[in-house]
Amino acid sequence: MAAAAAASSMAKRKQRKAATEQEVENHDEATVAAEAGPENDGHTAHAAEEAAAAEEGVEREGGGEGGAEGEEGPDAAARGGEEGKEEEEREVSFDELGLDEQLKRALRKKGLDKATPIQREAIPLILEGKDVVAKAKTGSGKTFAYLLPMLHELLKLSAEGRIRKSAPNVFILVPTRELCQQVHNEASSLLEFCTSKLKVVQVNASMSDKDIKVALSGPPNILVTTPACVASCISKGIIRGSSIKESLSMMILDEADLLLSYRCEDDIKALVPHIPRSCQSILMSATSSADIEKLTKLLLHNPFILTLTEVGHAKDDLIPKNVQQFWISCDAKDKMLYILVLLKLELIQKKVLIFVNSIDSAFKLRLFLEKFGIRSSVLNAELPQNSRLHIIQAFNARLFDYLIATDDNKSKEERQANKGNKKDSRVSRKQLQQTLDAEFGVVRGIDFKNVFTVVNYDMPPDPAGYVHRVGRTGRANKTGASISLVSPKENGIFEDIENMLKDVENRDTSCISPFPLLTKNAVESLRYRAQDVARSVTTRDIKEARRQDIKNEILNSEKLKAHFDENPRDLDLLKHDKLLSNKEIPAHLRDVPEYLIDPTTKEASNVVKLSRAAMDIDKPRRRKRMGFKGGSGRSSDPLKTFSAEGKSRRRGRKERDGEQDRRKRKKVES
């Protein structure tokens, strides 16, 4: 009831505002609303609602149920116009959205009070049981936009004793294992503060059938997985189709536009016959595409479409305004030189996420930076799942500041060309037998914490890839920056990106500016050193580094599986930025002599350092935060002290014993 009241109140405010601004265009807007579907009877009210939603920043399209609810006359709208404008500018708290008290308590514990625009719009609609397609930029809060109403409904059913037990009640389908882990962690963190015992599990293709059966025993209320894994479970009889029809009440597709590009179309189609007609479906995406339209027609019934276009009154379509975009023109052979100058002369803020298009490029860059004393780690599809997750956690915990991530996704045209080539399809089957993980994905969905700078060492294959890469910084309204190194061969894709951003933001000038802190003198001062070191990194060195890194991470993965389930805070026991090369690093390469740094570059570097100090970025980390208490630990080890008591308790006991001895001595003396 509370959710319905909140949704109704919001709709009325929008309609009051819209009526004053759309009197002249009511006929045209009504025609647009009439074309949305034959079930829309309240054309004028629906048009007003669409106009109001667009003014606020969320474009809403819907079927029959979204029509003429709560229509008011022009006089009432005129009286409430200014009031509605003030109300819409006011932030909405989670308390106003009608969520369960347990969830509100969990949000308060996490320090969350205000809903983001996509949460403000999507949560009431999902609570009303409507199918929803929500499109919003990365970092806008889409995960909680579906987790909160989903958990609210399950908590309500659990309290009423109406949960069906034959199969999971909710499927959350995501394209990658990393995102699967992230969504599972977010849902679990909310349920920690709930008294109702709801169970959420994740399964993936790397698990054995036995482990999957154990995980699905019960069964759980919420299953987070990939389409390929759930389709495999159905085909093997681990999950029965009849049980899904009986129990499934909600299905959520996160990063929906990426699901089909990850070869999940057949898996999703195999799942469709088992989905009950009454199942509520939700699609979350950062972009619009033909794939979204295909999934919408396949799974949803008369959905509401929410497109987040603005936050307040500042246009903020694809790239947040708090993210500065820069580019540097350079030859492909000079890219390592430019990266060296940016990092060694400290012209960009840490933490830095560097994107490359191949694994060999990633290791070549890592070996190159090692020669200059710059430690980094590589995140790629060859690594074991546990190691990939641990690298992300360690990077988020600032155990190292530079992460090189491989983004192997090809453009849509290349995928279609390869799909029609039989020879290529045979090669892809061989590749599937190798160690590359088809469900690996680092660009989409993964929540990197406090990344300040994203560097496109290699340009992405398409504009959408650029948007998703840059979306790894500037999350949760924090400032960020992106720097793209553009070679002459990449000018075409760079122009496509610029044109897309111009069209979206309706600008004549470029949205991406030349990087202002880099001077020609700074680049030339390190050119000869960089060229000598780059030549020393051979193909053989790269292959050996890849082999050594995989060997190290396999050992790490086995340790991780046994240890970190019980000790999740001990993140720095394993180092992912160890030196890969066995060759001794020349001492003169670690530091840049003062005479090589020109005054302009030195001043720019000082500005970056002062900015970093003002943001408290370089505050020293305490070992205690990572699960270490310092000291030898002898006093608290019962095997070494023959005492199960801690140091403070024994100290108190000694003081009490000493006081008793003094009293005895006084009695004897008297």
Swiss-Prot record:
EC number: 3.6.4.13
Regions of compositional bias (Basic and acidic residues) in chain numbering: 18-30, 40-49, 654-670
PROSITE patterns to which the protein is assigned, alphabetical: HELICASE_ATP_BIND_1, HELICASE_CTER, Q_MOTIF
Cross-referenced Pfam families: DEAD, Helicase_C
Motif, DEAD box: chain positions: 254-257
GO molecular function: ATP binding; ATP hydrolysis activity; mRNA binding; RNA helicase activity
Comment on protein domains: The Q motif is unique to and characteristic of the DEAD box family of RNA helicases and controls ATP binding and hydrolysis.
Protein name per Swiss-Prot or TrEMBL: DEAD-box ATP-dependent RNA helicase 16
UniProt source species: Oryza sativa subsp. japonica (Rice)
